[in-house]
Curated annotation (Swiss-Prot):
This is Pesticidal crystal protein Cry1Fb. One of its GO terms (molecular function) is toxin activity. GO terms for biological process: sporulation resulting in formation of a cellular spore; symbiont-mediated killing of host cell. Toxic segment of the protein is located in the N-terminus.
Length: 1169
């Protein structure tokens, strides 16, 4: 008998399937907990305002409304989802506990209401304190009971209700505790408990939720249906409430706060109402594939659906979704399923009213007799829009109502007005296509978002506005959207390196004069800087602390809400807010949300004006404003200017203009008395003989809210002989005789910053200044304005006219002060000598750094009394040492010049003597470097009194090196360029010795280094090698041609110099000492002795600028003394041989027989004809 292949349509509610019956029971029993939870979420989102209203609202909504039988439904909801029943005893105990909490809370509210009506009544204050304490104790006990082992998951929905009540109670104590008569210490204790319990309750809810969800993970679609229902319903009953716990922080949110939930939940009538699910292969993962990955929030704008016929059944076959982001820009998605544009049914297109409800008509089609396979699909669906009862349909409406799964937030009104969620997106899962003999299903999956997530990111002027970071409209490169941890109400933005997170389009409903402060809720594995921009203009920049360890979990306690103290205002009603981060790499930074907090500053205008007037008047010596006070620095004037600029135009425009003119006058007076060239750092190294000179790694940066003008940043250095430096010379023509001058400025932060003032002596300070945030809360965050100008209107900004740090009578400055100053005394002035004053800022350590500005060098006072006598003594001592130095220099210069001249053939210095070798050049160079005071010992780039004669001789030394290198036909014979030009076999190294020489190290007998050299046949060459042998065996340097004509230089550890043998010689006999000395005397003479001390130079010679009264220690510069070539360490031997090639090519080979062979240099020099 043939099988009946006629398809049979089986209504979804007529199957004898116990699992479907359970699902129906879950919907009926789970509706009340969903209704109550959604109402609570609506209340927390909209009614969370200061006052006792929250407490009374919670009682009216939940604790005074829910009966014991209804509390039982909360327990039953999760019991059915996880198929775990709570024992009757524990169920009754939990319900009794909940009822007891409601009674205790009601008594507390009665006392709170009576106190509110008569807050000065002592008895009522005591009553509310007692009843608060009783309810607090009851909640602590109850919440512990709701964590009963093995029953944490079914008790979770009542746990979160009790936790929410406890946080609300503690918030009352923080807000009203002092009014109840609690001391401030007790109030602070309650506040600390509140913050700690927010994190503890959050973590318990998340851990329990994740455990329950993971327990439901399975393999088939039936298991996915239960998994998704648990995820959806506990998001509504637990996670959404937990996401609002941080708003109970009464000190962070003292006014009404607007929050948004951006997470998505899913429904699919095809899967969740299917009577056949377990037999679909890998159905769980296929259904989960319909859940969208993390993304920036979007809003469905249009939906087109096409039908598909599967085994004679017409079902939803595919669709096309178009959305818009929060900036209104369109987003087009790939086609879902099979899409036929010609047969598309228009569901929504450019309609601002979203769908709040679907009425689905799923179909489950089973084959004929003997055919167990099914076709599952959606035969039709109706979509109902908000604000109206109008329905748009795909083919027809059905009876599966999404409101049964996601109820309205208020059942008392029309659902199109009191809906809780809107349809945000539609995805599609499909299995497996047209394959005979298998199940086939087409399942649209509806994604829903909470109605609190508005499309336009509205910022209200009178409340705190929280905007989730995923509501950005533009994600910058390097930023990603990641799945939220569950307690943030949505997903997060993440970066692992410096850059911009995203751009957020915001809409301002209040006046543009309203000012705001920005806060960021973030988690980070590193200290970092956040910066913000509005419409491309910088607004804020500030340092923020690490909140978690790298690799740690995203827990509630790892998130921190912190912000910028300086307020700002928007210039346009519709603006783009940009958030970025810097100063870190290879770490993790997560952004949850941005908060805009109104800055109520109008009441401060009067006190601001009074403060600014006082500060301006304190700048001048008299009311006539003819002169500045001596202790008024340029930095002080800039800060007073900030005070004036921050005055309200609406309140005191005329006074502001008047004060601004006075401050400008003060600034001009300050500039006039400042003897520095370019004090505002317009450039460095712009003019050879004027202004600032500095190392190339110094940067000039525009003013921020620490500096109003430009400032410089000096980084650290890896070599103290090459420090980071900045200097300037004050010309003699600007100085007055017998006068004290002062260098002063402001240091934002520094480490190992050295400051010098040099004339007869060296005044020296090493200044370590911690960052501005560690001393007082100077703002370091904000730059704002239509032209990018900094906004320095921080409310904590203070200017103290008495704040100074000046050195008096030779006393040094106090270290670690942001304000610094150094004094220096000038004696007799001489324009011809032009001694002047050198100002030097230097850093010579790797960890050193400095940011400084507002530098001034100004006349302080004439010298009198002891100060006058001291500078005269210093001047005389300096002149005596100057004369002594001149005599010494004459001797050293003569010797050095003779040594240099002896290198060359004539006074044109264009040819070397035939017997000039590298040792002789080194010796001459060392003598040149004995000339003292060629450069200042404090900074070797500044020329000293002997700079001219030193540079004259040093130039000739460089010429000698160049001529010598040109004469050596072996390339890179000193290994300064590593192994360039050398052929290597085996393992060898080039090492830099502590005398700054590079040497070739041959550590193995099988290694060989060679070079092919082009020569002139018939001409004579000298092969000269300086080397050192360690251990047994011999080191050999061989020169040969293709066939024969081989010579060798051999080195061993037990002979100073080796005998030279013809190529056929196989023995190595030692030189005697006399033979070795004589063999090299013609070309090495003077090498060793050239480094001996010259008896004509005093051994205790000291730099001439040293003055004990002013300088600690001598001003010697070890880097200066180390200049020039240093001798080789003991043990190195120089040997040479004469070689006459017969062809135009020779090979030079370096090797050894055992031990280690170290070669300093290899030279092949053409003999003079």
């Amino acid at each position: 008998m043939k099988n009946n292949i006629q398809n049979q349509c089986v209504p979804y509610n007529c199957l004898s399937n116990p699992e479907v019956e359970i699902l129906s029971e879950e919907r009926s029993t789970g509706r009340l907990p969903l209704d109550i939870s959604l109402s609570l979420t609506r209340f927390l989102l909209s009614e969370f305002v200061p006052g006792v209203g929250v407490a009374f609202g919670l009682f009216d909504l939940i604790w005074g409304f829910i009966t014991p039988s209804e509390w039982s439904l909360f327990l039953l909801q999760i019991e059915q989802l996880i198929e775990q029943r709570i024992e009757t005893l524990e169920r009754n105990r939990a319900i009794t506990t909940l009822r007891g909490l409601a009674d205790s809370y009601e008594v507390y509210l009665e006392a709170l209401r009576e106190w509110e009506e008569n807050p000065n009544n002592a008895q009522l204050r005591e009553d509310v304190r007692i009843r608060f304490a009783n309810t607090d104790d009851a909640l602590i006990t109850a919440i512990n009971n709701f964590t009963l082992t093995s029953f944490e998951i079914p008790l979770l929905s009542v746990y979160v209700q009790a936790a929410n009540l406890h946080l609300s109670l503690l918030r009352d104590a923080v807000s009203f505790g002092q009014g109840w008569g609690l001391d401030i210490a007790t109030v602070n204790n309650h506040y600390n408990r509140l913050i700690n319990l927010i994190h503890r309750y959050t973590e318990h809810c998340l851990d329990t939720y994740n455990q329950g969800l993971e327990n439901l993970r399975g393999t088939n679609t039936r298991q996915w249906s239960r998994f998704n229902q648990f995820r959806r319903e506990l998001t509504l009953t637990v996670l959404d409430i937990v996401a609002l716990f941080p708003n109970y922080d009464a000190r962070a949110y003292p006014i009404q706060t607007s929050s948004q939930l951006t997470r998505e939940i899913y429904t699919s009538s095809v899967i969740e109402d299917s009577p056949v699910s377990a037999n679909i292969p890998n159905g769980f993962n296929r259904a989960e594939f319909g859940v969208r990955p993390p993304h920036l929030m979007d809003f469905m704008n249009s939906l087109f659906v096409t039908a598909e016929t599967v085994r004679s059944q017409t079902v939803w076959g595919g669709h096309l979704v178009s959305s818009r982001n929060t900036a209104g820009n369109p987003i087009n998605f790939p086609i879902y399923g099979v899409f036929n544009p010609g047969g598309a049914i228009w569901i929504a297109d450019e309609d601002p009213r979203p769908f709040y409800r679907t009425l689905s008509d799923p179909v489950f089609v089973r084959g004929g007799f003997g055919n167990p396979h099914y076709v599952l699909g959606l035969r039709g669906v109706g979509f109902q829009q908000t604000g109206t009862n109008h329905t748009r349909t795909f083919r027809n409406s059905g009876t599966i109502d999404s409101l049964d799964e996601i109820p309205p937030q208020d059942n008392s009104g029309a659902p199109w007005n009191d809906y809780s969620h809107v349809l945000n997106h539609v995805t599609f899962v499909r299995w497996p296509g047209e394959i005979a003999g298998s199940d086939s299903w087409r399942a649209p999956m509806f994604s829903w978002t909470h109605r609190s997530a508005d499309r336009t990111n509205i910022i209200n002027p009178n409340i705190i506005t929280q905007i989730p970071a995923v509501k950005a409209h533009n994600l910058h490169s390097g930023s990603t959207v990641v799945r939220g941890p569950g307690f943030t109400g949505g997903d997060l933005l993440r970066r692992t390196n410096t850059g911009t997170f995203a751009d957020i389009r915001v809409n301002i409903t209040g006046p543009l004069s309203q000012r705001y402060r920005v806060r960021i809720r973030y988690a980070s594995t590193t200290d970092l800087q956040f910066f913000t921009r509005i419409n491309g203009t910088s607004v804020n920049q500030g340092n923020f602390q690490r909140t978690m360890n790298r690799g740690g979990n995203l827990e509630s306690g790892n998130f921190r809400t912190a912000g910028f103290s300086t307020p700002f205002s928007f210039s346009n009603a519709q603006s783009t807010f940009t958030l970025g981060t810097q100063a870190f790499s290879n770490q993790e930074v997560y952004i949850d949300r941005i908060e805009f907090v109104p800055a109520e500053v109008t009441f401060e205008a009067e006190s601001d004006l009074e403060r600014a007037q006082k500060a301006v008047n304190a700048l001048f010596t008299s009311t006539s404003q003819l002169g500045l006070k001596t202790n008024v620095t340029g930095y002080h004037i800039d800060q007073v200017s900030n005070l004036v600029a921050c005055l309200s135009d609406e309140f005191c425009l005329d006074e502001k203009r008047e004060l601004s003119e006075k401050v400008k006058h003060a600034k001009r007076l300050s500039d006039k008395r400042n003897l520095l060239q370019d004090p505002n750092f317009r450039g460095i190294n712009r003019q050879p003989d004027h202004g600032w000179r500095g190392s190339t790694d110094i940067t000039i940066q525009g003013g921020d809210d620490v500096f109003k003008e430009n400032y410089v940043t000096l980084p650290g250095t890896f070599d103290e002989c090459y420090p980071t430096y900045l200097y300037q010379k004050i010309d003699e023509s600007k100085l007055k005789a017998y006068t004290r001058y002062q260098l002063r400025g402001y240091i934002e932060d520094s480490q190992d910053l050295e400051i010098y003032l040099i004339r007869y002596n060296s005044k020296h300070e090493i200044v370590n200044v911690p960052g501005t945030g560690s001393l007082w809360p100077l703002s370091v965050e904000n730059q704002i304005g239509p032209c990018g100008e900094p906004n320095r209107c921080a409310p904590h900004l203070e200017w103290n006219p008495d704040l100074h740090c000046s050195c008096r009578d030779g006393e040094k400055c106090v270290h670690h002060s942001h304000h610094f100053s150094l004094d220096i005394d000038v004696g007799c002035t001489d324009l011809n000598e032009d001694l002047g004053v050198w100002l030097i800022f230097k850093i010579k350590t790797q960890d050193g750094h400095a940011r400084l500005g507002n530098l001034e060098f100004l006349e302080e006072e004439p010298l009198l009394g002891e100060a006058l006598a001291r500078v005269k003594r210093a001047e005389k001592k300096w002149r005596d040492k100057r004369e002594k130095l001149q005599l010494e220099t004459n001797i050293v210069y003569k010797e050095a010049k003779e040594s240099v001249d002896a290198l060359f053939v004539n006074s044109q210095y264009d040819r070397l003597q035939a017997d000039t070798n590298i040792a002789m050049i080194h010796a001459a160079d060392k003598r040149v470097h004995r000339i003292r005071e060629a450069y200042l010992p404090e900074l070797s780039v500044i020329p000293g009194v002997n700079a001219a004669i030193f540079e004259e001789l040093e130039g000739r030394i460089f010429t000698a090196y160049s001529l010598y290198d040109a004469r050596n036909v072996i390339k890179n014979g000193n290994f300064n360029n590593g192994l360039l030009c050398w052929n290597v076999k085996g393992h060898v190294d080039v090492e830099e010795q502590n005398n700054h020489r590079s040497v070739l190290v041959v550590p193995e007998w099988e290694a060989e280094v060679s070079q092919e050299v082009r020569v002139c046949p018939g001409r004579g060459y000298i092969l000269r090698v300086t080397a050192y042998k360690e251990g047994y065996g011999e080191g050999c340097v061989t020169i040969h041609e293709v066939d024969n004509n081989t010579d060798e230089l051999k080195f061993s550890s037990n002979c100073e110099k080796e005998q030279v043998y013809p190529g056929n010689t196989v023995a190595c006999n030692d030189y005697n000492k006399n033979h070795g000395a004589n063999a090299c005397s013609s070309r090495n003479g003077g090498y060793d002795e050239s480094y001996e001390s010259n008896s004509s130079i005093p051994a205790d010679y000291a730099p001439v600028y040293e003055e004990e009264a002013y300088t600690d220690g001598q001003r010697g510069n070890p880097c200066e003394f180390n200049r020039g070539h240093t001798p080789l360490p003991a043990g190195y031997v120089t040997a040479e041989l004469e070689y006459f090639p017969e062809t135009d090519t020779v090979w030079v080979e370096i090797g050894e027989t055992e031990g280690t062979f170290i070669v300093d240099s290899v030279e092949l020099l053409l003999m003079e004809e």
